[in-house]
């Protein structure tokens, strides 16, 4: 489970007249984010709505905050306990400052609801992914009534209509194009915490991307739980745009140079989607396509809706359209009833397909899902051994991809200073590899050709094309 703390620079010129505090004394906002890129996007929107309505500025120190929010993820086991552990760490701040507002959002909030307040009565607001736009009203009602507020309803796409215009500082941005999931995989809580699939109107998505491009964004990542299941209404015509059509239109927006998307589902990888990789050069040569397992028996128990052979067929068609395409994926090891033969079929699929860096986990039982009722007799040590074997194979494949990039010329979008050396720069290749290289700050936010000189475990090192060769090998 990924974990991030939302930070943002000071107000833009357009915010110059916004007061830093309100009549209620609000001033600073701290958000801690767990989980996927959808949650990162949602956290940005929480900050946007509270800045617009109450003038809150982000801080990376919870002790300075007037509002503390936890944006939670329920994909992994013990997610709820993690939330209560984090809440316990800020409880003393509530005692020091009774006016402090503490809120819990995201999928754990959606799943647990009022149970959070019962267990942690110092929590002021609980809200779901679909009701984050109501945060200002929830906080105001909490202050006016003195009672904790809980809103975990599913008002479909209402939140997108209520959100302020996007505001970004860099060359990359996320754009949520749909919410929820209607696949109901037997192991997954997402349909229960984020609702069923609802797509944003076609024009709304294009307007947001165009707005971001006007702010200097060059790369957009289109987000959805099953992003390629997008079916957006086109104005009042009654026509529906599929994901391939949306990609075609985003591709034509001036200023946008790269398009990414996540997360996709193999069942929704239509021929029109495959053809997009042959026709749309701005669509990057990288795809995250979760397969979960390589055994048809396990895939059926997971209710994934495809076989291993059908998954391989999708991959073959994609690579025929874009030979340079690299794939990452998700794998669950130790699903209830998984035998050694089932596991070896997953290993065979990995060998046959070839994956870049991927996400793999031992199965986590999620209460309320169909898989939670399945008999699980595989010892934990066996599951851990299988996970280690699977990760070793994927790491080997990822290392081979990285080694194969040495000496190649890569188009890199420079995102900022290197995390390892602030005097150097960091950017990403099309296939989502981080590259660190010497360069001047004026390159930040621009596309640069970089020659890869060294491959490391989690990054590459290179030099700007045309600059004398870098031989340091520093990571």
Swiss-Prot record:
Q: Which cofactor does it need?
A: [4Fe-4S] cluster
Where, by residue number, does [4Fe-4S] cluster 2 bind?
181, 185, 188
Q: How is the cofactor bound?
A: Binds 2 [4Fe-4S] clusters. One cluster is coordinated with 3 cysteines and an exchangeable S-adenosyl-L-methionine.
Report what the protein is called.
tRNA-2-methylthio-N(6)-dimethylallyladenosine synthase
Please list the residue ranges annotated as the MTTase N-terminal domain.
27-144
Q: Where in the cell is it found?
A: Cytoplasm
| Residue ranges annotated for the TRAM domain, each copy included | 403-466
Q: What is its main location?
A: cytoplasm
Similarity comment: family membership = Belongs to the methylthiotransferase family. MiaB subfamily.
The reactions it catalyses are: N(6)-dimethylallyladenosine(37) in tRNA + (sulfur carrier)-SH + AH2 + 2 S-adenosyl-L-methionine = 2-methylsulfanyl-N(6)-dimethylallyladenosine(37) in tRNA + (sulfur carrier)-H + 5'-deoxyadenosine + L-methionine + A + S-adenosyl-L-homocysteine + 2 H(+)
What spans are recorded as compositionally biased (Basic and acidic residues)? 1-10
Q: What InterPro entries does the database record attribute to this sequence? A: Elp3/MiaA/NifB-like_rSAM, Methylthiotransferase, Methylthiotransferase_CS, Methylthiotransferase_N, Methylthiotransferase_N_sf, MiaB_methiolase, rSAM, rSAM_horseshoe
User: Where do the segments described as Disordered lie?
Assistant: 1-22
Q: Which keywords, in A-to-Z order, does the entry hold? A: 4Fe-4S, Cytoplasm, Iron, Iron-sulfur, Metal-binding, S-adenosyl-L-methionine, Transferase, tRNA processing
Quote the function comment for this protein: Catalyzes the methylthiolation of N6-(dimethylallyl)adenosine (i(6)A), leading to the formation of 2-methylthio-N6-(dimethylallyl)adenosine (ms(2)i(6)A) at position 37 in tRNAs that read codons beginning with uridine.
Name the enzyme's class.
transferase
Please state every residue range assigned to the domain named Radical SAM core: 167-400
* Pfam annotation, one family: UPF0004
Quaternary structure, per UniProt, is: Monomer.
GO MF = 4 iron, 4 sulfur cluster binding; metal ion binding; N6-isopentenyladenosine methylthiotransferase activity
Q: Which domain of life is it from?
A: Bacteria
Q: Which EC numbers does the record give?
A: 2.8.4.3
Q: Where does [4Fe-4S] cluster 1 bind?
A: 36, 73, 107
Q: Which GO terms describe its cellular component?
A: cytosol
